Design a protein with these regions (language model features):
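Active-site-proximal beta-alpha core segment in soluble small-molecule metabolic enzymes
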Residues: 3-7, 11-13, 24-168
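Active-site anion/phosphate-binding pocket segments in diverse small-molecule metabolic enzymes
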Residues: 5-8, 13-16, 28, 80, ...
């Protein structure tokens, strides 16, 4: 009696394939509950498509996608912090790319894990975390495997912001540019203007962007008629009108 997600596999996979063709350098994101599909399902789909890199949210999710059969590179999107023991254990894994968002963390990794693969995160208008434009010139990767620069843009990606930040970053240390939330036109313009490898992280648009391929079903256990003003549910809200309340399994 559980809620079930039903997938029109052919339609869903066609959508995913089309996005891979439209966005060269696409990196699938598999994090949290796997956008409702499960991390194992997404890891297997990425492997089926022969993607070279999979993005996860946290270091703890690496084992889950590997258990599902993923055997290529993994970038951990949560920036590394010294207190994260799981992330620290993974740093020297040659297939792990660690995101670094503070100069002091970059310095520590350079000293203690000189062969680690890292991506430097830039501060955007999201104001989450990242190296500020003023700090870019202080970035010293040393012997680290520098995999480029990453930025987390607002849902409506800002091409001008992405170009400005990326241009300043690659002028200091040339490398790939990892972005999110740009539409296809802006992404192609950015690729052309920067002249470096670009990677597009994609989660929601990739996995949930074909709603016609998805449907849900559930078992209805009871239907109760309630009158206007009757309290119901955990929060005891009042019914705005006479209606039926379904209880599903």
């Amino acid at each position: 009696m559980t809620l079930k997600l039903n997938i029109d596999t052919r339609s869903w996979r066609n959508h995913i394939k089309e996005l891979h063709e439209e966005f060269p350098g696409l990196v699938p994101v598999a994090k949290g509950n796997g956008y409702g599909f499960g991390l194992d399902v997404l890891a297997r789909e990425a492997a089926r498509l022969k993607d070279d890199c999979l993005a996860v949210g946290t270091a703890q999710e690496v084992a889950k996608v590997r258990d599902a059969g993923w055997s290529r590179d993994v970038i951990v999107l949560n920036p590394w912090r010294p207190f994260d023991e799981t992330a620290t254990v993974l740093i020297d894994d040659p297939q792990i790319i660690t995101v670094v968002s503070r100069l002091e963390d970059l310095d520590e990794l350079r000293k203690k894990h000189p062969r680690a693969r890292v991506v430097a995160e830039l501060m955007t208008s999201m104001r989450r975390h990242g190296i500020t434009p003023e700090e870019i010139e202080s970035v010293d990767a040393g012997s680290l495997g520098f995999e480029g620069w990453t930025m987390h843009l607002p849902l409506k990606g800002q091409l001008a912001e992405a170009k400005q930040l990326a241009s300043a970053a690659i002028a200091h240390h040339r490398g790939a540019v990892w972005v999110s939330h740009l539409d296809i036109g802006d992404y192609r313009r950015l690729r052309t203007q920067l002249g470096v490898q670009t990677r597009m992280r994609m989660g929601t648009r990739l996995w949930l962007g074909a709603p016609q391929a998805l449907s849900t079903t559930a078992t209805v256990l009871d239907v109760h008629r309630i009158t206007r003003g009757t309290r119901y549910g955990y929060h005891q809200a009042r019914a705005p009108r006479a209606t039926g309340r379904a209880t599903r399994g």
